[in-house]
Regions:
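Conserved glycine-rich cofactor-binding loop
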Residues: 12, 19-21
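Substrate-binding pocket helix/loop in short-chain dehydrogenase/reductase
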Residues: 98-99, 103-111, 211
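Active-site helix of classical SDR
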Residues: 122, 163, 171
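Residue(s) in the substrate-gating loop at a strand-loop-helix junction
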Residues: 147
């Protein structure tokens, strides 16, 4: 048996939300595995820092500071690329509110960012992938960043749960439509990860204690845990995996 090694040389990966946290870790991990990167975030200063790290691995890196909910801007960026082999659809947010107190503008913004822009990015990147004549031979990978909250309920997260559950349905539908082109589509579903986005929540000692008690492995995920799963799904090591989810949740959803 020949064990497939993770080697992403001659592959180009686009990562959104790449300026910080999970997206940053994923971009760096993909570069370490040999991929060239296209990184997108809202803040150029953050992108410059990530780009500098990526180039240490001798990978090419192009960065774009933009809002992924701006369809015209995203379309122009993707259409101007020579090729895309891997998409890490990572940009997203959470605005915790009790269901009865969810503000209309917050709900609409989360749906726009977490679900609609994810759909547009996936569609645009897939069309770019299909421009490569030997796509069926070399394959492609779309990784939608979901959440364990797409699989379980949680307080003050009804809108977040809804948007991430939508990604699970999108992923399965895409996987079926794109299988004939050897483009695989999966989600990665992390538990609470220590990132700038979750840092404020974890300052609450009661919340931190109660959350840890729900994770059988007894710790929060690190961004490297998520990046490892993403790199695996981006590579030929996962060539028979599509239309499913990798739960990086420390056992939370098994309880």
């Amino acid at each position: 048996m020949h064990l497939k090694k993770i080697n992403l040389k001659n592959r180009t990966a686009l990562v959104t939300g790449a300026g910080k946290g999970i997206g940053k870790a994923c971009a760096i991990a993909l570069a370490e595995a040999g991929a060239d990167l296209i990184i997108i975030s809202r803040t150029q200063k953050d992108l410059d820092k990530v780009s500098k790290i990526i180039k240490k691995f001798k990978s090419k890196c192009t960065s774009y500071a933009c809002d992924v909910t701006n369809y015209v801007q995203i379309k122009n960026i993707i259409n101007n690329q020579k090729k895309i082999d891997i998409l890490v659809n990572n940009a997203g947010t959470n605005i915790p509110e009790h269901f009865t107190k969810v503000k209309k503008q917050n709900m609409e913004y989360m749906v726009k960012l977490n679900t609609i822009s994810t759909f547009h990015l996936a569609q645009l990147c897939t069309l770019k992938m299909l421009e490569t004549k030997n796509r069926k031979k070399i394959g492609g990978s779309v990784i939608n960043m979901s959440s364990q909250m797409a699989h379980v309920g949680g307080p003050i997260r009804s809108v977040y749960n809804m948007t991430k559950a939508g990604l699970e349905g999108l992923t399965k539908g895409m996987a079926i439509d794109l299988a004939k082109n050897n483009i695989r589509v999966n989600t990665v579903c992390p538990t609470f990860v220590v990132t700038p986005m979750t840092k404020e929540f974890l300052k609450n000692k009661k919340f931190k204690r109660e959350t840890l008690n729900k994770i059988p492995l007894g710790r929060f995920a690190d961004v490297s845990d998520v990046a490892t799963a993403v790199t695996f799904l981006a590579s030929d090591s996962s060539s028979m995996i599509t239309g499913t989810s990798i739960l990086v949740d420390g056992g939370w959803t098994s309880i």
